[in-house]
Amino acid sequence: MENRKTFSWLKEQMIRSISVSIMIYVITRTSISNAYPIFAQQGYENPREATGRIVCANCHLANKPVDIEVPQAVLPDTVFEAVLRIPYDMQLKQVLANGKKGGLNVGAVLILPEGFELAPPDRISPELKEKIGNLSFQSYRPNKKNILVIGPVPGKKYSEIVFPILSPDPATKKDVHFLKYPIYVGGNRGRGQIYPDGTKSNNTVYNATSTGIVKKILRKEKGGYEISIVDASDGRQVIDIIPPGPELLVSEGESIKLDQPLTSNPNVGGFGQGDAEIVLQDPLRVQGLLFFFASVILAQVFLVLKKKQFEKVQLYEMNF
């Protein structure tokens, strides 16, 4: 009887432990997914400022090119591709958060016209799914389905990102019209230089915060440096903290000036933005255009036939 009670108690404790583990996993997984993927989502209601500048440029300071390719025109309720290319030298290595070197990651934000959105999985063809790969897109905000974000993802595999887009149908969405619309895109390769709170990352250059002489350079156990700068005029001492990653450019006893670079700039990445235009085409206009072309061709055919008939009549009259 006592053994049975002990077994029952052990069974109950095991069930509780498993339940707690599952709850912790779910909570942790949810918090991670909510924080992923782009810092801009946390601090900006709209990723494109009134000036046209995409806010990712606030953290990624270097300017690099991107290329966006979309169809010239699409029909309503149609799935099409928006292809973003983020070119860079695949041999480059970036400074990671721990100071070590690693491959570059890429990320992007695609700002579509109102009404355009990510195509649902059941509307994406197998060929398009193969082009997309294992990428997972998400809306910038739940109420902004026309703004899509992706990343960070490995740059070597996804320097070309294919977005599956569904065009709107003005027949069901009265605020959408058959017009030419702009599309805006921003893409980065590599880590940023500034965090959203304004602090520097270890992927940027560090400058002296005071004029003076480098009295001491202390190499920290986990990487990085503490640089003691003494002002010769008043003896005031300032300590500049350098995180692991950037290479030191100064040495002890060296005289330096305010804002003089203490380290190299390890950044090899950068951010770029571009735009394109797309026409939401009315099917009736296309049909009308095809009818017009057919009419012109038929008119040309009848004109040729009439000319040949006239020539035959002239030849007959001359022979008569």
UniProtKB/Swiss-Prot annotation:
Q: Which domain of life is it from?
A: Eukaryota
Q: Which GO terms describe its biological process?
A: photosynthesis
Q: Where are the transmembrane segments?
A: 286-306
Q: Which GO terms describe its molecular function?
A: electron transfer activity; heme binding; iron ion binding
Gene Ontology CC annotations of this record: chloroplast thylakoid membrane
Cofactor requirements of the protein: heme
Question: Could you say which protein family the record assigns here?
Answer: Belongs to the cytochrome f family.
Subunit structure comment from the entry: The 4 large subunits of the cytochrome b6-f complex are cytochrome b6, subunit IV (17 kDa polypeptide, petD), cytochrome f and the Rieske protein, while the 4 small subunits are PetG, PetL, PetM and PetN. The complex functions as a dimer.
| Protein name per Swiss-Prot or TrEMBL | Cytochrome f
